[in-house]
């Protein structure tokens, strides 16, 4: 088993990561002599077993009527852009599963900010279980003095502000990941600006732990990881709480999202209103952002590290209803309800190091379109 993460984190991670890896089977598509024109076969949604994680149904590109002769172009692009793992699910079944270099299906990789999706869903579950409400003041769970704000300013910040990147805290501090009170300084009134600020997001882990009176990893394992057969662990890396897992575990979570919080017949997130808010525009400052989810198909968007609003869709080549977890160094989890697709990409940065969206998204979807259309 190997793990992918910055070298200077290796000692910390290797001493902490004790979870089991999946031993999942290969899923190369079959080739057979068939007519040039193929009628796609409608498929019901499939859910891989949660107790036998090496078992996962596949469906061939040929059966779906996709273009197999475009797959090599995709693989070349992925390999040229430092990809470790790539998966496409259609109706829950594996269509494409490819690993590069020494990376295998059993290896674990950092999700980086794609893991924000996990935290967002866990907040929804905690609300559904009445441990908290997203309209509650953050101070209710972190106590007075969690920031350098006045008491009244602290009380004005809600969990929803943390979910939507609208806390108004100063993102120009020396370390925007720092969650110490001296790093959390007033800049703008809540709800008046959108800025991708990691520190307020990270504090949601403490909100969940204190609201549920349990360990954050334990609550996540009980409510999401174990019920859907995921493997993995959140590990503290500096101020950040980073999730590590196999690519297939990321695909499982994508499938849970695609089915709106239900795994097979087991409801995980029952609150449909929360799920809909989570995966739709959560405010009018950045239409392409829900509750820690990135959204495609909107008229404008903002990106990490910038105060500029850009016109147009976040990923023009991708379906308009796509929503996603987008992490540093191009960790990607895409869900497309209209096509019943989940797409996973793990690896290194394709070019410059960015915290979320990048040009890689649009280039990748251009190549995926050549296969599925």
Model-derived features with residue positions:
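Penicillin-binding protein/beta-lactamase superfamily catalytic region
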Residues: 229-337, 350-358
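Active-site SXXK
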Residues: 92, 109-135, 162, 204-208, ...
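Active-site helix/loop module of the DD-peptidase/beta-lactamase fold
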Residues: 129-167, 214-246
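N-terminal leader/targeting segments and the immediately adjacent pre-domain N-terminus
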Residues: 22-104, 109, 127-132, 164, ...
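Short, well-ordered beta-strand elements
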Residues: 339-348
């Amino acid at each position: 088993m190997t793990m992918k993460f910055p070298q200077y984190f290796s000692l910390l991670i290797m001493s902490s990561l004790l979870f089991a890896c999946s031993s999942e089977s290969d899923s190369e598509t079959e080739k057979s002599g068939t007519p040039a024109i193929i009628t796609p076969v409608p498929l019901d949604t499939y859910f891989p077993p949660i107790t036998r994680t090496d078992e996962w149904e596949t469906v061939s590109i040929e059966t779906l009527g996709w273009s197999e002769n475009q797959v090599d172009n995709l693989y070349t692009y992925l390999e040229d852009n430092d990809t470790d793992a790539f998966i496409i699910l259609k109706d829950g079944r594996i269509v494409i599963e490819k690993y590069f270099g020494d990376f295998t299906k059993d290896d674990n990789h950092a999700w980086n900010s794609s893991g924000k999706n996990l935290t967002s869903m866990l907040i929804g579950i905690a609300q559904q279980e009445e441990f908290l409400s997203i309209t509650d003041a953050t101070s209710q769970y972190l106590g007075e003095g969690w920031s350098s704000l006045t008491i009244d300013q602290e009380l004005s910040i809600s969990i929803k502000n943390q979910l939507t990147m609208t806390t108004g805290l100063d993102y120009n501090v020396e370390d925007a990941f720092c969650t110490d009170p001296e790093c959390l300084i007033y800049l703008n009134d809540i709800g008046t600006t959108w800025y991708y600020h990691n520190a307020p997001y990270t504090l949601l882990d403490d909100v969940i732990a204190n609201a549920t009176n349990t360990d954050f990893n334990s609550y996540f394992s009980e409510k999401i990881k174990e019920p859907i057969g995921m493997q993995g662990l959140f590990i503290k890396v500096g101020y950040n709480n980073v999730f590590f897992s196999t690519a297939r575990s990321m695909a499982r979570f994508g499938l849970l999202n695609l089915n709106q919080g239900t795994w097979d017949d087991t409801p995980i997130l029952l609150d449909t209103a929360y799920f809909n808010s989570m995966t739709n525009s959560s405010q009018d400052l950045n239409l392409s952002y829900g509750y820690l989810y990135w959204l495609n198909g909107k008229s404008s968007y903002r990106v990490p590290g910038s105060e500029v609003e850009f016109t147009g869709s976040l990923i023009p080549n991708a379906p308009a209803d796509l929503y996603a977890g987008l992490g540093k160094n191009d960790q990607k989890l895409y869900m497309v309800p209209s096509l019943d697709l989940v797409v996973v990409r793990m690896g290194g940065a394709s070019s410059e190091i960015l915290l979320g969206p990048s040009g890689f998204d649009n280039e990748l979807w251009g190549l995926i379109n050549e296969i599925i259309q």
